[in-house]
């Protein structure tokens, strides 16, 4: 008799995705972050659902309702901080996941990669709208500044901004619709994740060597389920430590001040995971140019498969491009730091140099290094 997991219509799909999935035998811990992202998503939906039960999306009561959750709801403070810091964990895992894809040339599976970019944009939109909901000073002014960027679009910009706001400023209508979108988007993300996995399982996983691993595959369960459980335990340990010891470490103190349209905070800045893109936006004096650079800072990832010049897929055997890759990582950390600094000398010039370097490495230096390495290895 065939095992039920292999014959049942629903269990069969789960079996082919998580149990009998043929997986390269040599994938390292950098491949753990896909499953960690899944855990983060489940955690965010679960905690978010409980928060939504007590939250009110009205400008007069939103801030108070968050305070009420933390003070009066059983373990409300825990749910709230798990949700807020869970978002940070989500983005840490996302950045590592994308970074691993860049390092090992996983972007050569174009459908999976493009689906990942769409997912990245969707998660960023969800996180941005979630940041607006507590209706603190940084929530209000962050929403005002970021939505206002759309006014840079020629001809329809101003109309578009007022349409998104639901009025002439960020107000009750804006908060209500942001809450609605913030609630629905994670479920759309779940659907997109399924498509992402569908494309991934069409081609199979890449591996550190970048070579074809068809001749050396092992079942996903028990080998990688055990390996993933270790990753999940470490992630939860890190998250729970953050939540219980320093829950406000990654937040902004200004968000503990209720939103006041008459008083602008000294430094308007988004959450830490958007600072690199915010620094790129600020480094261009022109508004439309800044908005385009902001979008391109993520969209440039879609060009990676077309900019791949080397005959080797992975960077494992390419020391020149490896060096450029780690300079790019350092550059992104620099941009993250700059995004949180005031707009004054020397931060402006550092931000501009780091922004130019970011695009130069991806668009010029890495493709050139690939050709040079091929030449040196006599692979032409």
UniProtKB/Swiss-Prot annotation:
GO cellular component: mitochondrial inner membrane; respiratory chain complex III
Binding site for a ubiquinone: 201
Top-level division of the source organism's lineage: Eukaryota
Sequence positions that bind heme b b562: 83, 182
Cofactor mode of binding and number, as noted: Binds 2 heme b groups non-covalently.
Signal peptide: none
Cofactor(s) it depends on: heme b
UniProt-annotated location(s): Mitochondrion inner membrane
InterPro entries per record: Cyt_b/b6_C, Cyt_b/b6_C_sf, Cyt_b/b6_N, Cytb/b6-like_sf, Cytochrome_b, Cytochrome_b_C_euk/bac, Cytochrome_b_N_euk/bac, Di-haem_cyt_TM
Miscellaneous: Heme 1 (or BL or b562) is low-potential and absorbs at about 562 nm, and heme 2 (or BH or b566) is high-potential and absorbs at about 566 nm.
Quaternary assembly: The cytochrome bc1 complex contains 11 subunits: 3 respiratory subunits (MT-CYB, CYC1 and UQCRFS1), 2 core proteins (UQCRC1 and UQCRC2) and 6 low-molecular weight proteins (UQCRH/QCR6, UQCRB/QCR7, UQCRQ/QCR8, UQCR10/QCR9, UQCR11/QCR10 and a cleavage product of UQCRFS1). This cytochrome bc1 complex then forms a dimer.
Protein family membership: Belongs to the cytochrome b family.
Protein name: Cytochrome b
The encoding gene: MT-CYB
């Amino acid at each position: 008799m065939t095992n039920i997991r292999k014959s049942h219509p629903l269990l069969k799909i789960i079996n082919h995705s998580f149990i009998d999935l043929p997986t390269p035998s040599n994938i390292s811990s950098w491949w753990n972050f896909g499953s960690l992202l899944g855990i983060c998503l489940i955690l965010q939906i679960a905690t978010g659902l409980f928060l939504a039960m007590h939250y009110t999306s009205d400008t007069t009561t939103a801030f108070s309702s968050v305070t009420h959750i933390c003070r009066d709801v059983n373990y409300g403070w825990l749910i709230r901080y798990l949700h807020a810091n869970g978002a940070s964990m989500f983005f840490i895992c996302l950045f590592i996941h994308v970074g691993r894809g860049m390092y090992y040339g996983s972007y050569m599976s174009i459908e999976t990669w493009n689906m990942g970019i769409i997912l990245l944009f969707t998660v960023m939109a969800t996180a941005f709208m979630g940041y607006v909901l507590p209706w603190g000073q940084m929530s209000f002014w962050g929403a005002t500044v970021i939505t206002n960027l759309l006014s840079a679009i020629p001809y329809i910009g101003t109309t578009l901004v007022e349409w998104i706001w639901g009025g002439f400023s960020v107000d009750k209508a804006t908060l209500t619709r942001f809450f609605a979108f913030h609630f629905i988007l994670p479920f759309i993300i779940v659907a997109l994740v399924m498509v992402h996995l569908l494309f991934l399982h069409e081609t199979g996983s890449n591996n550190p060597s970048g070579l074809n691993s068809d001749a050396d595959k092992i079942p996903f369960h028990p080998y990688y389920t055990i390996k993933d459980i270790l990753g999940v335990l470490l992630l939860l340990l890190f998250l729970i430590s953050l939540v219980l010891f320093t829950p406000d470490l990654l937040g902004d103190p200004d968000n503990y001040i209720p939103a006041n349209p008459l008083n602008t905070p000294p430094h308007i800045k988004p959450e830490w995971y958007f600072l690199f893109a915010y620094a790129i936006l600020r480094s261009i004096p022109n508004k439309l140019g800044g908005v385009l650079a902001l979008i391109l800072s993520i969209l440039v990832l879609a060009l990676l498969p077309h900019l791949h010049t080397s005959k080797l897929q992975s960077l494992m055997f390419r020391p020149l491009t490896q060096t450029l890759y780690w300079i790019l990582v350092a550059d992104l950390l620099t941009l993250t730091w700059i995004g949180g600094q005031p707009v004054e000398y020397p931060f402006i010039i550092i931000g501009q140099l780091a922004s130019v370097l970011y695009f130069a490495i991806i668009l010029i230096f890495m493709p050139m290094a690939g050709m040079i390495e091929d030449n040196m290895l006599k692979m032409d």
